[in-house]
């Protein structure tokens, strides 16, 4: 018997990712990136819910089912409203009782 996973709605996934970003950015991003993000966030900042990529295994070393995770990017958008400077990519489990997450930080 398989259990149906209640997926995170985009707004909830975005809130979770942004909270984690604010909490962990200081430990994981270069100070220059933090300064750039803070200076430009009001004008160009974005947090986007995107289609879950299927290449996370290459990044985190664990095979995942894209249907069981939400992917959210935090970064800066350009004039075409496209995120062209990604500071963190989040992979967040849809399972509320086991809300694991993975983050790829800008290097």
UniProtKB/Swiss-Prot annotation:
Coiled-coil region list: none
InterPro entries, A to Z: dsDNA_mimic_put (IPR007376), Put_dsDNA_mimic_sf (IPR036763)
Source organism, top-level taxon: Bacteria
UniProt cross-references to Pfam families, sorted A to Z: DUF440
Function text: May act as a double-stranded DNA (dsDNA) mimic. Probably regulates the activity of a dsDNA-binding protein.
Family per similarity comment: Belongs to the putative dsDNA mimic protein family.
Name this polypeptide is given: Putative double-stranded DNA mimic protein NTHI1680
Organism encoding this protein: Haemophilus influenzae (strain 86-028NP)
């Amino acid at each position: 018997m398989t259990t149906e996973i209640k997926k995170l709605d985009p707004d909830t996934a975005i809130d979770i990712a942004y909270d984690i970003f604010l909490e962990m950015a200081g430990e994981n991003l270069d100070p220059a990136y933090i300064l750039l993000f803070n200076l430009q966030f009001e004008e160009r900042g974005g947090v986007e819910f995107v289609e879950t990529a299927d290449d996370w295994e290459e990044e985190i070393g664990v095979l995942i089912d894209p249907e069981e995770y939400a992917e959210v990017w935090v970064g800066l958008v350009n004039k075409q409203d496209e995120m062209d400077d990604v500071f963190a990519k989040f992979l967040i489990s849809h399972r509320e009782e086991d809300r694991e997450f993975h983050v790829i930080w800008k290097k």
